[in-house]
Amino acid sequence: KIEPDSAFGRHPPEVLPSPDEAADFYLYAVEHLEHHGYRQYEISNFAKPGYEGRHNLIYWDCGDYLGLGPAAHSCMGGRRFYYPADTEAFLNDKAAPVMDGGCGAEDYLILQLRLRKGLDLAAYKARYGKEFSTAQLAFVKNCVKSGYATFDGSTLALTPAGLIVQNSILAELL
């Protein structure tokens, strides 16, 4: 979706690629970048080995992080919260943090499948006590057959083609 108030929305191109063309462009970009030594480590991030953006990995792994200031988001001890964006209220100590839940099993699954390393099912079970159902495993098998995922029995990872349709895959797994 193109947001109407964004620069792109205010000055849209005359022609946009079709969804199929956009997918082809994405797959070409993945191949081109990997050919030049940039490894895709997350749905929209590439880096040379050892130069991955570590700061984002804490979010994808549902780790603890502390944000300070107006509009800052934090996750501590599995509980997420944020401060309202009102700077005046924050400075006057009138901005109470707003709780918005924690990083539960669904969040973890969604965030781990953003990463090319994928979801370690043993870690998922250890952390949340959840295992994939027979129906979910059958769906995973179909994703592998279709070239959307790899699954070695312990780790489920989406391929570049799978990352394109990640939302549809997640809808089936959740």
What are these regions (language model features)?
Residues 161-174:
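Short, amphipathic alpha-helical interaction segments positioned at domain boundaries
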Residues 129-144:
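Short amphipathic alpha-helical interaction segments
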Residues 43, 135, 153-154:
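Residue-level detector of family-conserved "landmark" positions at structurally sensitive sites
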